[in-house]
Amino acid sequence: MLCCAPVSIRAQVITPAQIFVVHGTPRDCTSITQLDSALSDNYQPFFAGWSEQDYVEAIAWSRACANFGWHVTGRSRIPLLQAQHDKAIGPVPAHVGTPAGGTSNPMPMRVSPDIALSGEPPSRAPLKLPADGSPVIGSDTTIASHYQDTLFDIARRYGLGGEEIIRANPGVDIWLPGEGTRILIPGRRILPPVSREGIVVNLPEHRLYYFPKPAKNETPVVITYPVSVGKDGDSTPLGQTRIIAKIQHPSWVPTQSIRDDHAARGDPLPRLIGPGPDNPIGDYKMRLGFGGGMYEIHGTNAPATVGMAATYGCIGMYPEDLAALYALISIGTPVRLINVPIKVAWSAGTLLVEAHLAIDAHGRAAAPSFDQLADVLHDSAQHARVSILWERAVYVLERADGVIATVGKGV
């Protein structure tokens, strides 16, 4: 059975003289492999400082760090990484943030692996489908960040994916947006141009839509969640299928190709990972009919990968989102996986466009082409008199940030 835990995003081997401090003992670590090795030897870090800006971003995505459940605490220029489950770790040293003899360069803040969610954020609440048949749902909002937030923290809190919030907020520091920074929460969406039943996953959008069957005299609703999809070379299949099985507390049996891939990166996997916090597919999974059940909708123990192309072909979800969806879904629920990078809609006499990065047959992402945009706009406008703002349309295409914009008006 193919199952697809998030793929670690790893930095290149970096320059020497970076110090990994473990129980007060310096240890040189010049690559992710060495860091993973240190973890596998049961070292637990007081703190770590790196001179390479991207390095902590890389380890935040690594399987080893996710399994150890590191959190950022403190407000030092180099934030503290503390292994919370290790009772042997005593009080934080006074010099935390700048290892003795190490670098004092600023370091990106690492994403917290679990975020306490209070209430039901608007992006996760069921949304009534417009009575007039319009495909436009939801609304955009703006919030002010707190000093300890990362964009990944905010994304998870508001039902967004990582890439979604990053592209919607260009110029905002991913790891340290700062106190009071205005953050756009893109909640206004154009529904995918397919039948509104069951589960629909739009791969370029990294988003799942669930259309529950309404009871008699009940207003139809949609519930939408961010998802991770297949990475470059391991694309998620397209087409129609159904949920053929639901499994709670699953074990993970990685295929030989997945094990070979991890081994080549110095991250060997066992043949079986049982249920629990170390299981990369989480506490629930729903098997799809593709390829004899080879693909699944499952959870993750690396939530920062949600909303990105990061799996071996499956659909990954935040644990709390999958738990909610799992309770709503029955075996036999139809599932449609589509590749629609550009969505259009008419609303109040204006032509709206929502553009995302296109995904090719191999899972590679790129800006959608002008021809794709022109075809979609032509199809939408052919039965109406409309003035298209082409410069605006091209700008929206180039940004491909998923934020709805007006590109035309009726005349």
Per-region residue spans from a language model:
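LysM (lysin motif) carbohydrate-binding repeats in extracellular/periplasmic proteins that recognize
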Residues: 146-176, 219-221
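Charged, low-complexity interaction regions
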Residues: 43-53, 66-75
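Primarily a LysM-type cell-wall glycan-binding module
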Residues: 123-159
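Exported/periplasmic cell-wall-interacting domains
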Residues: 258-411
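Intrinsically disordered, low-complexity
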Residues: 94-99, 105-115, 121-129, 170-172, ...
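Loop/turn positions that initiate beta-strands
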Residues: 148, 178-183, 332-335
